[in-house]
Amino acid sequence: MQAEGRTALTVRTWRTLFSVAWFVWILDLATKIWAVSTLSERSNVKVLGSFFQLTLIRNPGAAFSFATGATIFLTLFSIIVLLTIFYFSPRITSKGWAVVLGLVTGGILGNLIDRIFREPGVLRGHVIDWMQLPNWPIFNIADSAIVIAALISMVLSARNIPPITKVGS
């Protein structure tokens, strides 16, 4: 009986993880296509005054200008994180953690695709960022998904909900 329950949980959590990841990735891709076709480089379109603006940039690094020009490192790191998520995903203990890992997976895929395929070239691509808040780096949907995942993971951890089962459980 426990094996059947575990199988059902695994199927549900995998479905949740991959559905969330797919949704984030598609939304990120669609909004980046829209931003590139609609916004001009470095122009500010005020949506909510100076609080929320649309500003298109092509980011060669990560948030806060970290690792600018280290696209290959960021690409490899992203691939390692994705492989780690896939390795541990069969042992996810709850739908909440499946959502967290789905958000992270979708966010990583969104920025990884940019790094691999966008200009200036393969494995040197710049990430499309286009949303701006005051005193914060310009970001995109993928970045937002990763931040939301971090916040949800803090709540789950505070509630003592473990992310994965131990080997042999």
Can you say where each PLM-predicted feature lies in the sequence?
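Alpha-helical transmembrane bundles and membrane-interface segments of multipass inner-membrane proteins
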Residues: M1-S169
